[in-house]
């Protein structure tokens, strides 16, 4: 499991919350105080809660479970995609389409359409179309790729959501709650922690902080998967020669 120290968090600005006037009283127990009208998050609480969250992600990944990274705001979008791809998992980093989890049947049809269009673009079908028709299909493919590209190979519902901003992604969290899918989320001082199974109190705006969380989550998945391979090899009786 990837470890993140308090020093790492301080350097990334994890402790800086939102302006005090925007606070959510449900986050009171995680707030250390205020400085220049900005809430300061108590990292003595964040560090162990982050460890708990990573432990849970590790247990899911070790059982070959699917992790869905969700972060659609600009500060998180690119980092979410990079982290998910690095650990061979899944992501939504543009717009969360309502029903992405709760209406999976329909989403699956859209994914099938995306894959059909990708095949057509590669097997020469587009070349046989009129310029206008080819352009229309290319645009449709790009639009579908933008919203579904990160989940097109997920092959079913995820086993856990890793959310960067609980407030911004409240629809995703609600859908996961309805389906009983556990949620791990960064929750800032302006957000509501309800519906989050593993709360990580922290700054959800600073790019360095967002990258810190995502890198640790990706490392945790990779380590758990590698450990699983070692255990599997031992069970199968493979022993390296001296």
From Swiss-Prot:
CDD domains reported in the protein's UniProt record: RPS2
GO CC terms in record: cytosolic small ribosomal subunit
Gene Ontology terms: biological process: translation
Entries under InterPro entries matching the protein: Ribosomal_uS2, Ribosomal_uS2_bac/mit/plastid, Ribosomal_uS2_CS, Ribosomal_uS2_flav_dom_sf
GO MF: structural constituent of ribosome
Alphabetical keyword list: Ribonucleoprotein, Ribosomal protein
Superkingdom as given in the UniProt entry: Bacteria
PANTHER family: 30S RIBOSOMAL PROTEIN S2 PROKARYOTIC AND ORGANELLAR, SMALL RIBOSOMAL SUBUNIT PROTEIN US2M
NCBIfam families, alphabetized: rpsB_bact
Family the UniProt entry places it in: Belongs to the universal ribosomal protein uS2 family.
Name used for this protein in its record: Small ribosomal subunit protein uS2
Organism this protein belongs to: Aeromonas hydrophila subsp. hydrophila (strain ATCC 7966 / DSM 30187 / BCRC 13018 / CCUG 14551 / JCM 1027 / KCTC 2358 / NCIMB 9240 / NCTC 8049)
């Amino acid at each position: 499991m990837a470890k993140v120290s308090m020093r790492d968090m301080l350097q990334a600005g994890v402790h800086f919350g939102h302006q005090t006037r925007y606070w959510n009283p449900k986050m009171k127990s995680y707030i250390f105080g205020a400085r220049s009208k900005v809430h300061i998050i108590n990292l003595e609480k964040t560090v162990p809660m982050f460890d708990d969250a990573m432990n849970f992600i590790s247990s899911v990944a070790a059982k070959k479970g699917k992790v869905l990274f969700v972060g659609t705001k600009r500060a998180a979008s690119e980092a979410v995609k990079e982290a998910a791809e690095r650990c061979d998992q899944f992501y939504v980093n543009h717009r969360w389409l309502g029903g992405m989890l709760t209406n999976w049947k329909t989403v699956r049809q859209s994914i099938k359409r995306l894959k059909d269009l990708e095949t057509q673009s590669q097997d020469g079908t587009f070349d046989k179309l009129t310029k206008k028709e080819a352009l229309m299909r290319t645009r449709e493919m790009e639009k579908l790729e933008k919203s579904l590209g990160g989940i097109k190979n997920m092959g079913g519902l995820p086993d856990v959501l890793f959310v960067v901003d609980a407030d911004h992604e409240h629809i995703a969290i609600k859908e996961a709650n309805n389906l009983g899918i556990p949620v791990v989320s960064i929750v800032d001082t302006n957000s509501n922690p309800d519906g989050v199974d593993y709360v990580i109190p922290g700054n959800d705006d600073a790019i360095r902080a967002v990258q810190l969380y995502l890198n640790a989550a990706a490392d945790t998945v990779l380590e758990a998967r590698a450990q699983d391979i070692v255990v599997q090899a031992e069970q199968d009786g493979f022993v390296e020669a001296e």
